[in-house]
UniProtKB/Swiss-Prot annotation:
GO terms of biological process kind: apoptotic process
Name this protein carries in UniProt: UPF0669 protein C6orf120 homolog
Its biological purpose: May be involved in induction of apoptosis in CD4(+) T-cells, but not CD8(+) T-cells or hepatocytes.
Subcellular location: Secreted
Family classification: Belongs to the UPF0669 family.
Signal sequence annotation: 1-23
GO CC terms, sorted: extracellular region
Keyword list, A-Z: Apoptosis, Glycoprotein, Secreted, Signal
Pfam families given in the database record: UPF0669
UniProt-annotated glycosylation sites, renumbered to this chain: 47
Classification via PANTHER family: UPF0669 PROTEIN C6ORF120
Organism lineage: Eukaryota, Metazoa, Chordata, Craniata, Vertebrata
Amino acid sequence: MATPWRRALLMILASQVVTLVKCLEDDDVPEEWLLLHVVQGQIGAGNYSYLRLNHEGKIILRMQSLRGDADLYVSDSTPHPSFDDYELQSVTCGQDVVSIPAHFQRPVGIGIYGHPSHHESDFEMRVYYDRTVDQYPFGEAAYFTDPTGASQQQAYAPEEAAQEEESVLWTILISILKLVLEILF
């Protein structure tokens, strides 16, 4: 007789834990961020969905892959960014976050790519306006110069470019291997 009550109590506790976790996920957004939009969608493997952002200022895109793996590509020079034509990207498994600087030309193109490792991907993207004001929007080095000229910083990190190229190559290689395996079997 106590077993059904224990099961019911465990179910109630489990639902409370799930609710608490969901609340904590939503609360980890800084107070300075203002939620503008919530976009939900579904994307097929190897396909793109495109969105356009017209809001001015610093914008934060937080996309969660609910099922599968959706990747995020952003550009202010093309309305259809892709994995080989973008300015900003986030290609993680799970939550993707991209911070769009205020100086990006509007409209900003947003490409959501369904990774080929999953037949379909469901995603939810939250668009936030960041109300914080950068004291030095181009970095402190842009405003204060060393009179001796001894400290020159490189604006471009070659390690990052090599890592991005490597990521694209791995994606292409995996896609080719899947295609070969699909043909053989």
